[in-house]
Each structure stands twice: as C-alpha cells, then as structure tokens.
C-alpha cells in the first residue's frame, strides 16, 4: 500500500497490474479497497492485461477523514481526480459500483480530463434508496455531535476502522468544530434528497447528458430497492451513446448479497464476474484509441 497526499489528505492506494489500459476502481458504502471482492476484481482485470488503481476514499479505510464539499461523493470524486493527476496516471476507465458508481459518475462529470471511459453498476437511486443513504451516512454522526460533541462522533462504531487504520483521524475529528461539522453533514444529507433534474444524487441531469466518453451501465435487478432498475435504465438513456447491459448474475443478486453480508460474507464478493463483460466492452469501444 502506498500513500499520496492530495489537498492535505493522506490517500491510501495500490496499483495492480502493468497493462496499458488504466482503470480506477471504486467500491461502495464506506468500504475500503481491502473489502472482499474489490481487490479480487482488480486482480481479475490485471490478469487480462489491465492496470488497476484501487484506493481508499476519504472517510474509508486507511485514508484521512474529510468533511468539506457540497456532498461526500463530490468531495471523493475531486480527490480521485487529484490522485490520478498527482500520480501522472490516466486518463482512466473510471469504474465502480453502488456508492462507487456515484463517485465515478461525478468524477467523469467534474473532471473529464481524467476519464477515458465510465463503467457503473448498482447505481443508487429512487426515493427509498436515496433517503436511506442520507440517514445511514449522516444521521448517527449528526446526532452524536449535536448531543455530545466530536469525541462522541469519533467513538461511533462507523468510524472505528478509519481511526484504527489511520490513528491521526481521531485528532482530525477532535479538531473539528461541532457546529461546522453538523452543517456539513446536513448539507451532505440534503444532497441525497431527491430533487427535480437530479437522477443521481449530487449531479444535475444536464451535466450527465453532456458526457462524451464511452459509458457502460449495468442494469440493476427489479428486486433491488436501493439501486433501482429505473435508475440504471434512465441513466443509460441520459448519457449519449451509453451501453446498457445485463448483469452476469440473477435478478435477486443485491438482496442475496445483503443476506450473505448479514452472515459475514462481503457484499462485493461476486464483482469479479463482471470482468469478462468489462473487458469485452472496452475491447469494442476502445476508450484509449
């Protein structure tokens, strides 16, 4: 694992493989690059002649915590673009699932110079899905800061991994003004709330429609309440020339992975099944010429 400093933040990353085509792979949730399925997907891509950067977003894994920006995903997208530029890598195929799909989309929209292509699956959307994200990612920290201050935030179970893996993160929390912290998380919370003209939280449909790179969208399952099928299909229709493809698994994949995760398995364990489809698509679309 290597560490890069991007805008004053410590960002943990690894480059896997030595192929000519570069991928930037981003997981969802607040999961690390070391979470089950992420590295395996990168290694499967590398085994097919690709080069892949996996990284810990701010607020994930061994990277620094950061509470700035209009939304958490926008902040992470800006850091990914900064990481690729600082390493003199790219442009890359920006790829990810769930929250990583949102970060990937925002990266391509906000920083077109680092994106040669875009691939997304399990794209969060819908009223239920987006409101759930707002509550999950913001509510516990807002409540803790409001009632007991920043030490209580740092003691929350959801931040235990980032503090254990990067102990300086505890000091980062304690240095934050609780009122400013609450204001930031309420802004992030608002960004998840469904708004007219925003299919994907945090980015306008008009900006998405302006994308001019090869784009792959994997259709979501009809049974998935968090990454709705309508979101994936509508997003593919918004992006000129986007390819909407069927997933390499059944309709209940997300539901079954949630059940498996409750038993200790990883949500992303089956992501490597996407690799043949990703390779076939890039071979056909030739994003890097």
Give the ranges of each region predicted by the language model.
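Catalytic active-site module of serine/aspartate enzymes centered on a nucleophile-bearing elbow/loop
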Residues: 241-289
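Glycine-rich "HGGG/HGxG" loop immediately N-terminal to the catalytic nucleophile
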Residues: 55-73, 255-256
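Hydrophobic, aromatic-rich cap/lid helix
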Residues: 169-206
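Short beta-strand/loop motif that positions the catalytic acidic residue
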Residues: 211, 217-219
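Conserved acidic catalytic loop of the alpha/beta-hydrolase fold
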Residues: 74-92
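Flexible "cap/lid" loop of the alpha/beta hydrolase fold
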Residues: 102-105, 109-146
């Amino acid at each position: 694992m290597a560490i890069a400093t991007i805008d004053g933040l410590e960002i943990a990353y690894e480059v896997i493989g030595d192929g000519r085509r570069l991928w930037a792979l981003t997981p969802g949730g607040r999961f690390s690059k070391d979470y089950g399925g992420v590295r395996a997907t990168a290694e499967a891509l590398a085994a097919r002649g690709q080069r892949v950067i996996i990284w810990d977003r701010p607020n994930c894994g061994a990277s620094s915590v950061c509470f700035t920006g209009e939304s958490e995903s926008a902040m992470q997208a800006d850091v990914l673009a900064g990481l690729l530029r600082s390493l003199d890598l790219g442009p890359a195929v920006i790829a990810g699932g769930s929250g990583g799909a949102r970060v990937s989309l925002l990266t391509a929209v906000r920083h077109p110079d680092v994106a040669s292509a875009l691939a997304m699956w399990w794209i969060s959307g819908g009223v239920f899905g987006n409101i759930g994200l707002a509550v999950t990612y913001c509510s516990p920290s807002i409540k803790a800061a409001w009632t007991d201050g920043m030490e209580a935030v740092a003691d929350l179970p959801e931040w235990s991994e980032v503090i254990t893996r990067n102990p300086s993160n505890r000091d980062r929390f304690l240095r934050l003004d609780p009122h400013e912290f609450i204001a930031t998380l309420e802004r992030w919370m608002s960004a998840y709330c469904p708004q007219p003209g925003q299919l994907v939280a945090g980015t306008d449909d008009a900006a998405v429609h302006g994308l001019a790179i090869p784009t792959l969208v994997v259709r979501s399952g009809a049974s998935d309440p968090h990454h709705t099928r309508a979101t994936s299909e509508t997003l593919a229709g918004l992006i000129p020339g986007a390819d909407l493809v069927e997933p390499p698994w059944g309709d209940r994949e997300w539901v079954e992975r949630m059940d498996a995760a409750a038993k200790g398995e990883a949500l992303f364990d089956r992501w490597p099944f996407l690799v043949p489809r990703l390779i076939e698509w890039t071979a056909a679309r030739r994003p890097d010429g």
